[in-house]
A protein has these predicted regions:
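C-terminal hydrophobic structural anchor segments
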Residues: 327, 333-390
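Short, hydrophobic beta-strand segments
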Residues: 120-126, 313-316, 363-369
Length: 424
């Protein structure tokens, strides 16, 4: 176990003691634990290669030596490492191991907030504030001894810096980020190392001369707002250590904030016609789940990942709340049409809806609304939902999906994949 910066590991009197624990190469580590014969080989866990969902979901330390990247296609990974051993993902198995790890966390606090299957925040302020580093060491050793995998743990006074700490040194390491050392450890790191600064945000920051987390922390807040909107305020606060978000308690009710689906296509999507086929299936799935849970949404988000693994996300807020498949599909396609450049084929796309209201609120109408048409569409959607629930997803489909049965032959509602956080 490697421990980074024990000299500056003391938290201040009024600080919280937050841990972020990350199971190293989780999916791959579990597979190697269950099959010791492959432990010393380059191993990657992947999706279904036959349906071109054969992307790398996780890899072990040996595979990392060949620069294997999460999210790339199996064939690309094997080009770098011909001897790469790929094993299919077994989410039910990983869920059981995740539960075992969380049971150890719960021995120390009831404030355990999962972040995917492989990561979690712990708030140990109440009982172990003055012994945060000691507790981190103990948790790390117990997981290694009792379960057989390793974790990297960040110790800090807020969730953002604790997460940074767990990423700072891997595998099997503990890093303390305190008020005395964060300007050295955090500020000198690339902007993209800050939680929630994705590829698109990083590129926008680079365009205005911001390359490190320290650059974000010391940038004029007005500059960040101009180029990033409210997101600029958020990451400015994160970079300066202002995060005060609480760690949720075990079993604490968490209100649904978004409903979405994404998929890797069986072939590259080269035009809007290709995108439309998959987008409809995704939108239909999202809207069915919204209706099942009694929600209507107002903000539609789309994501696009090209063959170079570059991802962009865009969103649009509607004038009224809706759960109609036609409304969400229309908004999603407008975003795809506006942002797809026809030059870079897409490997995967996603659709999600946020900004919810319960479907029992009065319908908001405007002068352009056709209430009779809306009521008719609501009845149609509900009827189709019942048919699909009883007879399966393929019992009835729009004729437009028949133009390419290969692209549309998936059911995201039933085949939703849980990816490790690193994939996102």
């Amino acid at each position: 176990m490697k421990i980074c910066d024990t000299v500056n590991s003391k938290l201040y009197k009024n600080d919280r003691a937050i841990l972020h624990s990350d199971c190293n190469c989780f999916y791959a580590s579990v597979e190697c634990l269950l099959n010791p014969n492959i432990r010393d080989l380059p191993v990657a866990v992947s999706g279904d290669a036959e349906n071109r969902h054969g992307i790398i979901l996780a890899k072990n330390e040996e595979a990392k030596k060949y620069n294997i990247k999460t999210g790339e296609a199996i064939w690309q990974a094997k080009k770098k490492c011909p001897q790469l051993l790929t094993v299919p993902a077994r989410l039910d198995v990983y869920k059981k191991f995740s539960d075992k790890v969380r049971r150890i966390y719960s021995n120390y606090t009831d404030m355990v907030e999962p972040f995917g299957l492989d990561e979690a925040w712990l708030d140990i302020s109440e009982d172990y504030k003055n012994d945060a580093l000691t507790i981190a060491k103990e948790i790390s050793q117990r997981i290694k001894d009792e379960i057989g995998i390793t974790v990297s743990i960040g110790v800090s006074f807020n969730k953002i810096f604790a997460k940074f700490g767990s990423d700072y040194k891997k595998p099997d390491a503990i890093t303390c980020i305190t008020r005395d050392n964060y300007k050295t450890l955090v500020w000198n790191s690339p902007a993209g190392d800050l939680l929630y600064v994705g590829g698109a945000t990083r590129k926008k920051l680079e365009q205005i001369g911001i390359y490190t987390i320290g650059d974000i922390a010391n940038a004029p807040i007005g500059l960040l707002r101009t180029h990033l909107g409210k997101w600029g305020d958020l990451i400015y606060g994160f970079a300066n250590g202002y995060d005060s978000s609480p760690v949720a308690r075990i079993g604490e009710y968490s209100e649904v904030k978004s409903i979405g689906n994404s998929t890797t296509a069986v072939r590259d999507l080269k035009n809007l016609d290709d995108i439309k086929v998959i987008a409809y299936v995704l939108c239909d799935s999202v809207c069915r789940r919204m209706r099942e849970q009694g929600f209507m949404g107002k903000t539609v988000c789309v994501s696009m990942r090209d063959t170079g693994l570059s991802t962009i996300t865009r969103q649009h807020t509607l004038n009224t709340y809706t759960s109609l498949t036609s409304d969400i599909t229309k908004a999603a396609m407008a975003l795809f049409k506006e942002n797809f450049d026809n030059k870079s084929p897409l490997r995967s796309i996603g659709v999600s809806v946020t900004d919810f209201a319960h479907n029992n609120i009065p319908r908001q109408m405007d002068i352009f609304s056709d209430e009779r048409k809306i009521i008719a569409e609501e009845k149609l959607d509900k009827t189709l939902d019942k048919l699909k629930q009883r007879f399966g997803n393929y019992i009835i489909r729009p004729a437009s999906l028949l133009t390419d049965r290969g692209l549309s032959a998936f059911n995201p509602k039933d085949e939703h994949t849980i990816h490790p956080v690193g994939y996102l």
